[in-house]
């Protein structure tokens, strides 16, 4: 099997941070070479843009915000993702372009056609081989976000914003079931872990 590009995504409060550890442990047990990274971020340029994008004091317009996301992504692809895949290393990214369709598209209202143009220009033919989409009901997401001490620029949004974000994620997953695995993360940790491991086992033929 060629090196796989895997993404982990979902609305805020879906449990990405917790379940990244599950994915890391899965790769470690099998001794597979893997690189973990994140968006926005993953490179010095990307991390600098991340600071701007997540800062509650940032007053960026929708187009500027979307362009910053894709600027960070282009640097990420060229500097991290493609070199790792070329070296035979699997890549797992905490968020990728699905998040832009969901947050800037669904949440903010950026036309999907405009995002698709940027996606094609920045990524060419690069798409994830597998996307693990963690999903929780809106009320669970909002409750978990509410427990966050310091909320970033997106976490400060209201429930209707996250309702639209979640809707786009689920619509994209339904339209491309061969790439997405929707994981119900509104369960206990062991059940979620077992679901993720089952998906990875099936994808890698373990």
From Swiss-Prot:
Listed binding positions for ATP are: 10-17
Q: Which GO terms describe its molecular function?
A: ATP binding; dTMP kinase activity
- What EC number is given for this enzyme? 2.7.4.9
Describe the reaction catalysed, as an equation: dTMP + ATP = dTDP + ADP
Top EC group: transferase
One GO cellular component term: cytoplasm
Q: Which UniProt keywords apply?
A: ATP-binding, Kinase, Nucleotide biosynthesis, Nucleotide-binding, Transferase
Query: Which domain of life does the protein's organism represent?
Result: Bacteria
InterPro entries the UniProt entry points to: P-loop_NTPase, Thymidylate_kin-like_dom, Thymidylate_kinase
One GO BP annotation of this record: dTTP biosynthetic process
Tell whether RNA-binding is among the UniProt keywords: no
Q: What NCBIfam families does the database record attribute to this sequence?
A: DTMP_kinase
**Role, per record:** Phosphorylation of dTMP to form dTDP in both de novo and salvage pathways of dTTP synthesis.
Q: Which family does it belong to?
A: Belongs to the thymidylate kinase family.
Q: What protein am I looking at? A: Thymidylate kinase
Question: What does the record give as the organism's lineage?
Answer: Bacteria, Pseudomonadati, Pseudomonadota, Betaproteobacteria, Neisseriales
- Gene responsible for this protein: tmk
């Amino acid at each position: 099997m060629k090196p796989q590009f895997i993404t982990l995504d979902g609305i805020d409060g879906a449990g990405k941070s917790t379940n990244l550890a599950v994915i890391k442990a899965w790769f470690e047990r099998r001794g597979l070479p893997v690189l973990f990274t994140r968006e926005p971020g993953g490179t010095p340029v990307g991390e600098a843009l991340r600071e701007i994008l997540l800062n509650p004091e940032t007053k960026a317009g929708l187009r500027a915000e979307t362009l910053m996301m894709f600027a960070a992504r282009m640097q990420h692809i060229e500097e991290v993702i493609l070199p790792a895949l070329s070296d035979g290393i699997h890549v797992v990214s905490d968020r990728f372009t699905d998040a832009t369709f969901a947050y800037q598209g669904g949440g903010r209202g950026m036309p999907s056609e405009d995002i698709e143009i940027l996606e094609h220009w920045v990524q060419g033919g690069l798409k994830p081989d597998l996307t693990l989409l963690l999903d929780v009901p809106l009320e669970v997401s909002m409750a978990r976000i509410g427990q966050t001490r310091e909320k970033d620029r997106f976490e400060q949004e209201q429930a209707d914003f996250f309702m639209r974000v979640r809707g786009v994620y689920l619509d994209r997953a339904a339209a491309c079931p061969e790439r997405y695995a929707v994981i119900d993360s509104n369960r206990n940790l062991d059940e979620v872990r077992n679901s993720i491991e089952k998906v990875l086992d099936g994808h890698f033929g373990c």
